[in-house]
Every structure is written in C-alpha cells, then in structure tokens.
Curated annotation (Swiss-Prot):
This is LIM domain and actin-binding protein 1. The lineage of its organism: Eukaryota, Metazoa, Chordata, Craniata, Vertebrata. Keywords: Acetylation, Actin-binding, Cell junction, Cell membrane, Cell projection, Cholesterol metabolism, Cytoplasm, Cytoskeleton, LIM domain, Lipid metabolism, Membrane, Metal-binding, Phosphoprotein, Steroid metabolism, Sterol metabolism, Ubl conjugation, Zinc. InterPro entries: EPLIN_Lim_dom (IPR028740), Znf_LIM (IPR001781). Highly expressed in placenta, kidney, pancreas, prostate, ovary, spleen and heart. Also detected in lung, liver, brain, skeletal muscle, thymus, testis and intestine. Not detected in leukocytes. Isoform Beta expressed generally at very low levels. Isoform Alpha abundant in epithelial cells from mammary gland, prostate and in normal oral keratinocytes. Low levels in aortic endothelial cells and dermal fibroblasts. Not detectable in myocardium. It comes from Homo sapiens (Human). The modification Phosphoserine is found at residues 4, 15, 55, 132, 225, 230, 242, 263, 343, 350, 362, 365, 369, 374, 490, 601, 604, 609, 617, 686, 692, 698, 726, 741. A motif (Required for interaction with NPC1L1) lies at residues 164-166. Transmembrane segments: none annotated. Changing residue 25 to I: Correlated with lower plasma levels of low-density lipoprotein cholesterol; reduces protein stability. Residues 96-105, 146-177, 247-258, 516-527, 556-567, 656-673 have a biased composition (Basic and acidic residues). Residues 78-131, 146-182, 211-264, 323-381, 509-709 are annotated as: Disordered. Actin-binding protein involved in actin cytoskeleton regulation and dynamics. Increases the number and size of actin stress fibers and inhibits membrane ruffling. Inhibits actin filament depolymerization. Bundles actin filaments, delays filament nucleation and reduces formation of branched filaments. Acts as a negative regulator of primary cilium formation. Plays a role in cholesterol homeostasis. Influences plasma cholesterol levels through regulation of intestinal cholesterol absorption. Residues 595-607, 644-655, 693-709 have a biased composition (Polar residues).
Length: 759
C-alpha cells in the first residue's frame, strides 16, 4: 500500500467482482485462494473507511461538521427529545449529507459518492421509520438502536455479528460498522411503543392475512412494509412508481435526482463487463436466488428464534441482511441505472421476504406460508411403476419378486426350466424361442443332437423320426406345445418310462397292433423329450419282442423243436376225447405209445430220431388198420369216428374185452419177451416185475434203442400173418401198460393239462 490517499477506482472494480460473483463461490467451495484474495480486499476496505471518515470531516466546512456533531451530541446526551425537533435535525442532517455528496474532493469522488449514498440511505431510514412505525423491517434491521444503546454496546453486538457471519461477510460487515457509527447516533426510539408493535405482529391485520394467502411471500412482505421508505427506496428505479406514502415519493424523486450523479462516465468502460455478467445473473436467476437466499436464512432464523424473544438474538440475522444490502449498494453505486435496477429488484425481493419470518407469525399467517410453500412439494406426486405381468403365470409382478431375463419379466419363483421345472437364476439358464431351459437340458435337447438344420430345436424332432402316422403327430404336436407354454412342466416327466411299461402290458393283453400304436403315442411324445434313440424304433422293437414272447412261450418239460411239428394233430384230438374218461387205468393205456415217444424224443440224441420216426409211423399204420377192423365190429358210436380217431375205437374195444383176455396176454407177452431179449432181461408175470424192470432200466438211450428194435420186430411179425397181427398189437399195448409206472403216467397227465390250458 502506498502512503498516499487510496484511489478507490481500481479497488472498486475488484471488490465488485468479489462481492457479486465470488461471494457465492466462497460459501460453496470454500476455496482458499478466493479467501486470501478476499482478506486483502477486507483490509483495503477497512483502510478506505477510515480515510473516508477523516476526509469527510476535514474537507467539509465547519457548518456541516458542526451540524453533524450537534446531531450526535443531541442523540446521545439528550435521548428524550420530542419527535418534531428530532425530525428537523434529521432533515438537516440529510440535506447536509446530500450537499456533502455533491461536493467531494477530486481524489475520492466515487468513494465519497458511495459513502454518501450509504449514509443518506441510513439517515433517511429513521425519518421514514418515525413516520411509519409499524414496519417489520424497521424493527428487524437495527434492533439494538431501539433500546437507546451507546456505541460500546454497538461494538459488542458487532462482535456477535462476526460469529454469525462467514469469512465472505467480513468486508461488508466492517464497512457497515464504520458507517453505522456515523448514522447510529442520529436514530432514536420509535414513537410507537413496543407493545403496540408486538400486538400488531402477533394478531396480524386482516388485510395482511388475505394478501399472504393470495400472493407470494415477496408480495406479502411488500404489503406489510407498505409505508417503509427503506424498502420502497430500494424497489424504485427510474420511471417506476411505488405504492408508498407521500414522504417515500418525495425521497424517491430525491433519489432519482442523485442517481445520474452517482454513475460517473469514468467508470462506464469498466462497468460494461460487470453489467453484462451481474445483470445477466441477476435477471436470469432472479427467482432461484431469491428462493435460495430466503430458504437458507429462514432456516437459520427458525433455529435461533423459536420464541418471542427480545430483539437481541435477531441482531445476527437482521444485520446480515442489512450488510448484504449495503454491500450491494456499494457495488451498485458505480453502476449504470438499468443494471442497478435489476440487481436492486432481486435484492429487494430477498430483503422483503426476510421481515415476514423474523417476526413471530400469527397462526393464520403461518398456515398461509405453509400452504404457499407446499405446492411445489405437492407437484411431486408418487407415481407407481407400470403394472407388469409374469410371462409364465400371467400374474402381477411386484418389484421385490421381479426378475428380468431374456427381455421378459418373470417372478423369481416362476423362473424355471420348462423341461425339468427346476428353479433357475440368471447365471444358470438358457433360452430358445422364448422358452427357458436349464443348461444341462438345453445341451441335451438341442446342442448334443446337432439339429441345427431344423431351426435348432424349434421343430420337434419327432417329425424327423416318425413317419407312420403323420396326421396324428401333427395333431398332437400343437397340443403339446400349447400345454407346455400354458403351464410349467411338472417334475414328474420322468414317469414316462413307467407309462411305457404299462402301455406294453396292455398291448400284450389286447394283441391288437392298431390299439397298441394308439396307446403308445402319448408315451412316445413324453419319451421323445428324454430318450435317445427315437422312441419309434423302441416301439417297433418292443412289438417284435412281444411277438417273440408269444411264439416262444415256455413249456415244461421242454420239447425238441424238430419233434414238435411232426406230432400229428389227430393224436391231440384223441387225447382230448380220452381225457373225458374217469378211470386212471383207462386213460393210461392210449398214452403208452405217446409217453414212450415223448421220453425218447426229449432225452435221446438227434441221431436216434430216424428210428423213432420209423417206429412211430409203423405203429400208427398198424393202429389205423386195427381201428378199421374194430369199427366194423363195434357199435355205431365208435363207427362214426374217422380213421384219425382210430385210437379211440381201439381203446373202447380193448376196455370191453380186457377181462377175458388178461391171462392170454400175459402168456403171450412172456413168449414175446423171450424172443426179444434186448428189451427185457428178467421176465415176470406180475406188474411188480414190470415195475422192477423199469427201475433197473434207468438209462434212457438203451431203452429207446431196444424199444425201436422191439417195434420193428413186432411189425415184422404182424405183416407175416394177418391173424397174429391183431393179437400182437394187443399184446404189445398190454405190455406197455405194464411197463409204465404210475409216476410217468402222472407226468404225462400233467403235461397234457398244461397244453390244454395253453390252447
């Protein structure tokens, strides 16, 4: 700093920049660089204020100095002056200030002009306050002066102010304190007592409440401070009318005369930049700044002032507002008129809003203020999200159970594999054509089969495999797809093999291929999704197996495949008819040939089969010839039987004559056995000897060989003599009856019972 008087021009532009633009930045970002710059301006402002006071007192004449000092002396020495003398002194002081602003020194032209303007405003305030006492801003702006405090009290309260204000307010605060030292002595108590003011603001006038309900906060504050010159003075621009009283209009004209003098031509070139920036900011963000300033300071006020307390706690907030306006007035003093009006209007709005809230509001005004502040909140209505439905169950999906997969909305519980119905997550699913699968079944159904040519599983594989009943499959496929889409598949899909077995059993019982295919179809469609190779091949192989099971039905005891087709059907018919007879002895005789044949055919090697065939055919021919003779002799009922039924006639004839020929058979039987030594080693006359002979001859192969030779010999004898032929056959059959044991007869009967059940 130079020792010469400080030139205000350079610092005016810089301080303007700080107060207008960077003041908000300091509060928001707390930038250290800006704070340092601000501290420099703060020191410079203190020095300029001190120089301003000295230059004002030194450069003015004694008349002006004497008038100012007398006003101060009267103010502090005689606090009980009348209102008329006090208003006269205030008018004189205001005229002195105006003349002092008209004739400043050359060095401090702009500085003195701004200081005179601030002093003039602060001196005009008490005059307007005296004439319009019930004002909100008057009580809130300088409350410490109401109680008649001296300068020491004011300095202590200024320390309280410093605690409330931030670093960004220091310059404004100290400059305001220095200016208040000049102006505070000129203001005394109000003519209207505090009790009356208190009642007015507690009860509230009906006009005030109506306006509060009808208008916004700024309009209501303006209505309350209708007679206040401090508000109207700031509101009024050039060519603008106000709704204030006659005194405020007088001061308005005086103010309008002074405004052209304050805007010097030397500063216009510098103010062009700031006019573009500050006016644009104040005009565009007028309402937003107004809301922010009012909202932030109302919160501070509500925290501090919760009761109807003396004006002491209000000093911080009200002085803060006063300093804010005074700082803006210092910056606006060197600006052109339009920019000054814009920024002044914005400051007026922020200032007008404050006096509404620092005072304790009535219930009506509180309700109105709440109702006015609520509409922007009421505009934010709760909008429920759009109703979403689950793709699977078609029910409403709520946010807690919502799952978005494959660009579709599911319930978390409905997000399941369409094949196995297992619950899936976003990491374990695969989708194909809008259907959800778990990864193992997706690979099994589509990837491992390699059916990429058919749309990768979009066309069912059954169409490629099954070609028998295409029409039925075409009808079944859409039904299957519709069922699969409507309801998630149950986990019981693997019951399909059980159904397959049931269908096979039913088809075996029905023995109808058409019915089998129809019943097999649903099992195939279910099996199609599980089994590989295709189930149509399984169905055909299953039917072949069924036929094999029918053809090779086991019989006991087992027979040789070669001997079975050679068994004549007439023997079976005869056996059926013979089976009707009651006695075991009668049933046992015709089975002798068949029993011996069966035993030899089962247990003898295949090389023995030709003699068996030979012996069997010869015995059959002999039986047919004997049956023909018997048919001529016997009754009509036996004659009706055919040659194939010759055994039946023979046995009935034998049954009638068996008693008379028993002894003869036994004798001739012994002679035949002696001739055929290969057949019987130890001859016997009784049945016991025959039984012992059968027991001794346990190996079956020699028995079969001896039996075949015996048959050849007997038939050779039959062909020699015709008369002996019939006797030989009868004796041969009688011996066979003796040879058969009871156990073998029972076995034969059991075997034919099973055969009958089979047929």
């Amino acid at each position: 700093m130079e020792s010469s008087p400080f030139n205000r021009r350079q610092w005016t532009s810089l301080s303007l920049r700080v107060t207008a633009k960077e003041l908000s930045l300091v509060n928001k970002n707390k930038s250290s660089a800006i704070v340092e710059i601000f501290s420099k301006y703060q020191k410079a402002a203190e020095e300029t204020n001190m120089e301003k006071k000295r230059s004002n007192t030194e450069n003015l004449s004694q008349h002006f100095r004497k008038g100012t000092l007398t006003v101060l002396k009267k103010k502090w020495e005689n606090p009980g002056l009348g209102a008329e003398s006090h208003t006269d002194s205030l008018r004189n002081s205001s005229t002195e200030i105006r003349h002092r602003a008209d004739h400043p020194p050359a060095e401090v032209t702009s500085h003195a002009a701004s200081g005179a303007k601030a002093d003039q405003e602060e001196q005009i305030h008490p005059r307007s306050r005296l004439r319009s006492p019930p004002e909100a801003l008057v009580q809130g702006r300088y409350p410490h002066i109401k109680d008649g405090e001296d300068l020491k009290d004011h300095s202590t309260e200024s320390k309280k102010m410093e605690n409330c204000l931030g670093e960004s307010r220091h310059e404004v605060e100290k400059s305001e304190i220095s200016e208040n030292t000049d102006a505070s002595g000129k203001i005394e108590k109000y003519n209207v007592p505090l009790n009356r003011l208190k009642m007015m603001f507690e009860k509230g006038e009906p006009t005030q409440t109506k306006i509060l309900r009808a208008q916004s906060r700024s309009a209501s504050g303006r209505k309350i401070s209708e007679n206040s010159y401090s508000l109207d003075d700031l509101e009024i621009g050039p060519g603008q009318l106000s709704s204030s009283t006659f005194d405020s209009e007088k001061n308005e004209s005086r103010r309008n005369l002074e405004l052209p003098r304050l805007s010097e031509t030397s500063i216009k070139d510098r103010m062009a930049k700031y006019q573009a920036a500050v006016s644009k900011q104040s005009s565009s963000t007028n309402y937003t700044n107004e809301l922010k300033a009012s909202g932030g300071e109302i919160k501070i006020h509500k925290m501090e002032q919760k009761e109807n307390v003396p004006p002491g706690p209000e000093v911080c907030i009200t002085h803060q507002e006063g300093e804010k306006i005074s700082a803006n007035e210092n910056s606006l003093a060197v600006r052109s008129t339009p920019a000054e009006d814009d920024s002044r209007d914005s400051q007026v709005k922020s200032e007008v809003q404050q006096p509404v809230h620092p005072k304790p509001l009535s219930p009506d005004s509180r309700a109105s203020s709440l109702s006015e502040s609520s509409p922007p909140k009421a505009m934010k209505k709760f909008q429920a999200p759009a109703r979403e439905t689950c793709v699977e169950c078609q029910k409403t999906v709520y946010p807690m159970e919502r799952l978005l997969a494959n660009q579709q909305v599911f319930h978390i519980s409905c997000f399941r594999c369409s094949y196995c119905n297992n619950k899936l997550s976003l990491g374990t699913y695969a989708s194909l054509h809008g259907r959800i699968y778990c990864k193992p079944h997706f690979n099994q159904l589509f990837k491992s089969k390699g059916n990429y040519d058919e749309g990768f599983g979009h066309r069912p594989h059954k169409d490629l495999w099954a070609s028998k009943n295409e029409n039925e499959e075409i009808l079944e496929r859409p039904a299957q797809l519709a069922n699969a889409r409507e309801t998630p598949h149950s986990p019981g899909v693997e019951d399909a093999p059980i159904a397959k077995v049931g269908v096979l059993a039913a088809s075996m019982e029905a023995k109808a291929s058409s019915q089998q295919e129809k019943e097999d179809k649903p099992a195939e469609t279910k099996k199609l999704r599980i089994a590989w190779p295709p189930p149509t091949e399984l169905g055909s192989s299953g039917s072949a197996l069924e036929e094999g099971i029918k053809m090779s039905k086991p019989k006991w005891p087992p027979e040789d495949e070669i001997s079975k087709p050679e068994v004549p059907e007439d023997v079976d018919l005869d056996l059926k008819k013979l089976r009707r007879s009651s006695s075991l002895k009668e049933r046992s005789r015709p089975f002798t040939v068949a029993a011996s044949f069966q035993s030899t055919s089962v247990k003898s090697p295949k090389t023995v089969s030709p003699p068996i065939r030979k012996g069997w055919s010869m015995s059959e021919q002999s039986e047919e010839s004997v049956g023909g003779r018997v048919a001529e002799r016997k009754q009509v009922e036996n004659a009706k039987a055919s040659k194939k039924n010759g055994n039946v006639g023979k046995t009935t004839w034998q049954n009638k004559e068996s008693k008379g020929e028993t002894g003869k058979r036994s004798k001739e039987g012994h002679s035949l056995e002696m001739e055929n030594e290969n057949l019987v080693e130890n001859g016997a006359d009784s049945d016991e000897d025959d039984n012992s002979f059968l027991k001794q001859q346990s190996p079956q192969e020699p028995k079969s060989l001896n039996w075949s030779s015996f048959v050849d010999n007997t038939f050779a004898e039959e062909f020699t003599t015709q008369n002996q032929k019939s006797q030989d056959v009868e004796l041969w059959e009688g011996e066979v009856v003796k040879e058969l044991s009871v156990e073998e007869q029972i076995k034969r009967n059991r075997y034919y019972d099973e055969d009958e059940d089979e047929e």
